[in-house]
């Protein structure tokens, strides 16, 4: 807690996966850009993606032990209370030593002990939940939070307000029309042709690849071209057609989105948020692992009229030919979906989360 100074010290907690680290970094960057006086610290584990990404971005990473919630009664469950208490003590020490004014949690292993520690130190805390189905740390944290922000309407968290996803700057600032010619050049495709962008995430590509292998000729025959990120692991055969471009991965998603008119992809929270913020119609194939959060993320977009869904188990070349190809030919349906997507996604997620944090500090 600050004495006599007007600067604020923020502790952002989260990590483990890109889904937790990226929104955290977007908010950290927003806070840092707003004031050079304020201090932005990040709380994470040694094991998570944050251990590399946070220092790389120029933030100090404070460490907390990784203590997963027990899922079954076993030895780990028996040891959980002691290990969790230790993690809470670690965070309390960080809060006191750095005179933290507010804690912001993004889910993941670091968040649960951060919420408990903040309460015990009488420091306000804010919860941000990226998925339509919240994780356990955020379910528990939201009950006592000064403010809770969610990405998708209908996320079952106490007192939740829809604030959207804090997105990467290159997506927030993207002018798709202005970059389309450059994007066509980069990927070797014609910027004048309508383009279907297909990607499956690092793990989820195989199912999409198998379906596309049998469906791409029908898509091309319908007058479309395809940019398909097939992943490193899957040896998909590139048929060598000028209108069907297969690449292992895309490191410039801003340019891929600039070329795209429709997206076929998995339904991670960041993916759905970026596609919606850019007003792109989408067909989602939710990845059927984890606790079903992708299906719920996609359902939020479908309810709004911004997307369609094909369940993972039903994704075949025939299904793409019968469902995707007619949609690609329906200009009115696509423009309705594009208009609807602005109600699902926003480019203001970072600003909205920072406004929640400001509220918590001012209380």
Give the location of each predicted region.
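C-terminal alpha-helical cap of glycosyltransferases
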Residues: 326, 346-363
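A short, well-ordered alpha-helix in the C-terminal region of glycosyltransferases
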Residues: 333-347
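Short amphipathic alpha-helix
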Residues: 20-32
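Glycosyltransferases and closely related glycan-assembly transferases
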Residues: 90-103, 111-126, 139-144
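Donor-nucleotide binding loops and adjacent catalytic segments primarily
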Residues: 43, 48, 53-55, 176-185, ...
């Amino acid at each position: 807690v600050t004495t006599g100074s007007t600067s604020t010290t923020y502790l952002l907690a989260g990590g483990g996966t890109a889904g937790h680290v990226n929104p955290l970094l977007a908010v950290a960057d927003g806070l840092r850009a707003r004031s050079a006086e304020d201090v932005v610290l990040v709380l994470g584990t040694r094991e998570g993606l944050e251990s590399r990404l946070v220092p790389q971005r120029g933030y100090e990473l404070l460490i907390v032990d990784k203590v997963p919630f027990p899922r079954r009664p076993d030895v780990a469950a028996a040891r959980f209370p002691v290990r969790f208490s230790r993690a809470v003590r670690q965070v309390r020490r960080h809060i006191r030593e750095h005179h933290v004014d507010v804690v912001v949690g993004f889910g993941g292993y670091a968040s649960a002990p951060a919420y408990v520690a903040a309460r015990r130190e009488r420091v306000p805390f804010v919860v941000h939940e990226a998925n339509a189905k919240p994780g356990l740390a955020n379910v528990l944290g939201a009950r006592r939070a000064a403010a809770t922000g969610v990405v998708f309407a209908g996320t079952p968290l106490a007192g939740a307000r829809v604030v959207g996803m804090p997105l990467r700057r290159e997506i927030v600032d993207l002018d798709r029309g202005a970059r389309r010619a450059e994007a066509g050049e980069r990927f070797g495709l014609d910027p004048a042709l309508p383009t279907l962008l297909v990607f499956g995430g690092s793990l989820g590509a195989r199912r999409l690849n198998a379906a596309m292998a049998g469906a791409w000729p029908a898509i091309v025959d319908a007058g479309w071209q395809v940019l398909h990120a097939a992943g490193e692991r899957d040896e998909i055969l590139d048929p060598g057609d000028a209108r069907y471009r297969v690449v292992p991965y895309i490191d410039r998603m801003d340019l891929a989105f600039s070329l795209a008119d429709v997206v076929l992809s998995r339904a991670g929270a960041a993916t759905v948020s970026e596609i919606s913020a850019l007003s792109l119609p989408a067909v989602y194939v939710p990845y059927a692992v984890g606790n079903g959060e992708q299906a719920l993320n996609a359902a939020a977009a479908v309810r709004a009229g911004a997307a369609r869904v094909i369940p993972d188990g039903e994704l075949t070349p025939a299904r793409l030919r019968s469902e995707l190809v007619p949609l690609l030919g329906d200009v009115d349906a696509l423009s309705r979906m594009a208009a609807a997507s602005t109600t699902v996604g926003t480019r203001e997620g970072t600003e909205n989360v920072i406004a929640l944090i400001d509220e918590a500090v001012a209380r």
